[in-house]
Amino acid sequence: MTTLGGQVIAEESTLIPQLYAHEELLALLGAIAGLDAVPVRDPLERHVINVLHKPGDTHGAHTDDYPLALVLFVHALADPADGGLLEYASRAHHLSALRRSGTPRRAHRTPGDGYLLASDTTPHRVTPLRRVGLRRTVLNCAYTTPDRQQAVTPSAARLYRRDP
């Protein structure tokens, strides 16, 4: 998996940061989620790009630090049998729910698709790519509420920080 953190995206793109903080988008996300959606203060986690491009590439089971993730697909796999599927367990709160038979749901997406996920309370992962020549690229935008600006874990820093 190749990743780009928010600080790199902010340096290289004007469009993504503008879209991320657009007032109408924030209002729409807040209305859908029933929350006062606001941008995440941490530039590393605001928006990230994840690219799966090798056989076996996956995004392992996790929950996010912030309550909302807007995920937009740039590249997606045509055939669900090739992997790259979102697996999730709504309102499960524990990663173990993804291991229970019948619990995880799967979602196949195509380029241009997107979804809004209650990412702090929904364990989720991406299934491994199954062969050479595949690419799954997403822009993931994290949103929070005014009282939830502090990250709970250091995991994003491990994934997205720039090495010196």
Set out the residue ranges of the language-model regions:
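Signature of the catalytic double-stranded beta-helix
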Residues: 1-45
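Flexible, active-site-adjacent loop/turn segments at secondary-structure boundaries
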Residues: 17, 50, 59, 124-127
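Catalytic core of Fe(II)/2-oxoglutarate
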Residues: 85-164
